[in-house]
Amino acid sequence: MPHAAGRPASPAQTSGEELANSLTHGLGVGLSIAGLVVMVVAAARHGTARDVVGAAIFGSMLILLYLMSTLYHALRGPKVKLVFKVFDHSAIFLLIAGTYTPFCLSSLGRTRPAWGWTIFGLVWGLAVLGITFKGVFYGRIAKSTLRPPPLDHLHPPIVTPVNPAFVRRMGWISTLIYLAMGWLIVVPILAGLVGGVPVGEILPPRGLYWLFGGGLIYSLGALVYSLEKVRYHHALWHLFVVGGSACHVFAVLFHVIPGKVGP
């Protein structure tokens, strides 16, 4: 999905790299606002209230993710940086859940409503779990890294360092939550096949191409994200994230909202 999960902090980036990081996801903010407007208008014209709600939630979560990421990279100072890092990583969970929402309410809602509401509840529950986890994890980091000034030279503050094993363990937990959320979409598809419901009745083939194409672009971006020794790798990864989001917007706009037919 949009971010790599639970990795230790990357080496410090230059001011030029952070500017590029801010600009690339600032672009995402603008495109997300446009996507929200277009999806909601299309849903209002061609769909039902359920389609409007799904499109609005998805578009809003896109804006939230890109806005938090832009601010995180643009702001300076360790305290505010850590706060917005929590917001940034929490927004990932919200975007995953938000991306599921129109598919749960509209695509599955029209063909497999029980599955639609089940996946909807599970994915948003996992999002809440993930956000809680991130808050606790980074709260622990803050206590260790944001050291208060000593009271005097005889009574320095007592700070417990974070165990590297703890960081790795929390990283694995975070990764498992992301993976569980990302792969939930396979469950109703397989259940539909077992139950005799063709996948095409849930989502047209071209819609599936956009859906899984977006996931593939996100995954390729994760590989770019891992190239920490390459300058501006983070900004390049941001462009992959924007591309993955665009694919999912096209899937919703042209193949989830009723009456819309497109590429």
Please identify what each model-predicted range represents.
Residues 1-263:
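Multi-pass alpha-helical transmembrane bundles in non-GPCR membrane proteins
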